Amino acid sequence: PLKNMVLSRDCIWLSAGYCVAIRGAEMWRKQNGTNPYPVVLGVRSSVFLPYKQLGLVIVDEEHESSYKQKEPAPRYNGRDAAIMLGKMSGAKILLGSATPSFESYQNALSGKYGFVQLTTRYGEVMMPELLFVDMKEYRRKKMMKGSFTPVLYEEMKRVLENGMQVILFQNRRGYSTYLQCDRCGSILKCKHCDVSMTYYRYRNTLNCHYCGSLRAVPAMCQECGQGHYVNRTPGTERIEEDVKQYFPEARVARMDLDVMSNKAKFRALIDDFESGNLDVLIGTQMVSKGLDFERVKLVGVMDADSLMGFPDFRAEERAYDMLMQVSGRSGRKGERGKVVIQLTDMQSRVYQLVRKENYREFYTQLSQEREMFNYPPFSRLILVELRHMDGVVLRNAANELARLLRERLERRVCGPAEPDVSRVRKMYRIQILIKAEQGLSLSKLKAFL
């Protein structure tokens, strides 16, 4: 679309696999030659290609956590690398987002960045109507239709009868995110990782999303030997089954990493949905990323609570971002759309602020807490992670390292503490967090470490 609208010369689109595995060397030679591509559309690794006359760097959806590469090394933030590339090249830099990261928003408010705010939606279309639905009441009254509250069910029925389309968002893959014994309550976990295994009904297996191990579903509970495992917390596969059960005439497709194994499948699904060959699209966060379908008049968030509760100071920011982004898929053209958000914690401040659709107020409230506890954007964080197959050895080493760090860095050191998933691929993990306030020399700190 970009090439058709504004370009008269060649451009190249780079995915991670295309750039790195297949054509990396060829692209490098092309960009270093006398006739480089004038426009490169790429993932985060594209910032490391050579550019001779770079004039503009655009980072779309700059708030996205996927710009960070955590594993394997080198670990970097693609957005920050793009900003540095632009500065080194003397190019203009444009960061775009409806829900900017706190770091970028702080830079804009302080005058470090220029700030352009769009106060109306493209085409002057009204923002969708948000409906927050308390699942607790409907579950208590046994009024749920599978994964759907009566409110979402009726809205889906109305939209589908009018020949329009629906997007359902559930940020969990598989049929069930974990299996639990109906007698003793134990949860079936991976043998190599400290995490529950996801159940896939279509192949009747359990899969660990951390190490990739597979196992069959045991006939009886592995702990008490008497109970049976039951499904808990539905994933996209279960949502797809529910849609087919309650809306048998609807044409349904699923968009997640389990079915979108390559670019061709992704493109084919998008084309089918855009052309009206599908009625309901179910997906994980993939459905929230910049998709533009004019016939989508309803977005359903199946379980908003699953976006919260993570031991991460950015958890509320990411939940807000995700809800606002996925809500933006509804009613992008023509009549106003609707968004039905199913949840149980109706008092959460994140949901109250999403209802107001006021990012400035959201930022103000959370940034006050971050400043109080010295978190970004008011500090820089260094995460030190230690791993070992022996948990006792690891704990002793982590305690000693933390003691040595505190001798120099004092209260800047937090931990050691176990992360949410404390064991991956048979390796135990412990983390130490260092908070470096504004003005502290990071080069000296890194040299000390």
Feature names for model-found ranges:
Residues 1-38, 42-395, 403, 431-432, ...:
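Inter-lobe coupling/hinge segments of SF2-like helicase ATPases
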Residues 371-376, 419-425:
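Short, flexible, solvent-exposed loop/turn segments with mixed acidic/basic and small polar residues
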Residues 397-403, 442-449:
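Short amphipathic alpha-helices in soluble, non-transmembrane regions
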Residues 409-419:
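Short beta-strand elements
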Residues 413, 437-438, 446-449:
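Structured alpha/beta or helical-core interaction and ligand-binding surfaces enriched in interleaved
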Residues 422-435:
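Short, low-order "capping/linker" segments at domain edges
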